[in-house]
A protein has these predicted regions:
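Core segments of cupin and vicinal oxygen chelate
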Residues: 8-11, 17-59
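Short acidic/glycine-enriched loop/turn segments that link adjacent beta-strands
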Residues: 44-47, 69-71, 103-108
Length: 130
């Protein structure tokens, strides 16, 4: 029978990113349509607005960022162990695009690619990441 890895069964979407051409227009659209609120992320090399889609425990948070050459939606999955998740990705035919990367005081992030060429993120919360 089909066997699903525990990691895949436990992972849940935790973050999304939407490419935009006009950040102010996009903030207005998503704010008006869905009630999302935004906070500009200081220190990012380009515009990066964090979106809050619901109260604590509801919805998932995401971001708007300047559209580059690849205007695609990015989904990030929350996992218990970034190392185990990366191993599972590569062990099942996927690839690592950007390895384990520190987000100081927040956690660890990696960008991967599935067997169909779709990019997605992995995130492990760890407030001691430094």
């Amino acid at each position: 029978m089909f066997e699903t890895a525990t990691l895949a069964a436990m992972a849940r979407p935790t973050h999304f990113e939407i490419p935009v051409d006009d950040p102010d227009r996009a903030e207005k659209f998503y704010g008006d349509v869905f009630g999302w609120t935004f906070q500009r992320f200081e220190g990012a090399p380009e515009y990066y607005g964090l979106a809050t889609t619901g109260d604590e425990g509801q919805g998932i948070n995401g971001a708007l960022f300047h559209r580059g050459s690849e205007g695609v939606l990015t989904l990030t999955m929350s996992v218990d162990s970034i190392e185990d998740a990366i191993a599972a990705v590569t062990g099942h035919g996927g690839a690592v695009v950007q390895g384990k990367t520190q987000i100081p005081g927040v956690g660890w992030f990696a960008t991967c690619q599935d067997t169909e060429g779709n990019k997605f993120g992995l995130f492990t919360e760890d407030s001691s990441a430094s």
